[in-house]
UniProtKB/Swiss-Prot annotation:
This is Small ribosomal subunit protein uS10. The keyword Ribonucleoprotein applies. Part of the 30S ribosomal subunit. Involved in the binding of tRNA to the ribosomes. InterPro entries: Ribosomal_uS10, Ribosomal_uS10_CS, Ribosomal_uS10_dom, Ribosomal_uS10_dom_sf, Ribosomal_uS10_euk/arc. The keyword Ribosomal protein applies. Pfam families: Ribosomal_S10. SUPFAM superfamilies: Ribosomal protein S10 (SSF54999). It comes from the Archaea. GO terms for biological process: translation.
Length: 106
């Protein structure tokens, strides 16, 4: 396979369920290794914490009590030196609704 037909692809996975993100990353790495492609990753990126603090009581009366809600966004990064054939196979992987994928050609 010539160098012109191979491209470096950066895959970013992110989602609210870390087990789903890890499962999709593992499937991508396993598929790439089975196809004989050079893989780097999955590289865990920092988890982003989104916090929202809301007042429990709708009125201003009573004690000042608050609820804290948190959402964590887990991210993984995978670099693959892939051909068009490998990219087509990557598109067939089943991805849960909680995981989002970004592909970037480098």
């Amino acid at each position: 396979m010539s160098l012109a037909s191979r491209r470096k692809v950066r895959i970013r996975l992110y989602g609210t369920n870390p087990t789903d993100v890890d499962q999709v990353a593992r499937e991508i790495v396993d598929l790439a290794k089975k196809m004989g492609v050079q893989v780097r990753g999955p590289i865990p990126l920092p988890t982003r914490r989104l916090m929202v603090t809301v007042r429990r009581a709708p009125s201003g009366q009573g004690y000042h009590t608050f609820d804290h809600w948190e959402m964590r966004i887990s991210k993984r990064l995978i670099d693959i030196e892939a051909s068009e054939r490998v990219l087509r196979r990557l598109m067939t992987i089943r991805v849960p609704d909680t995981v989002k994928i970004e592909l970037q050609l480098i």
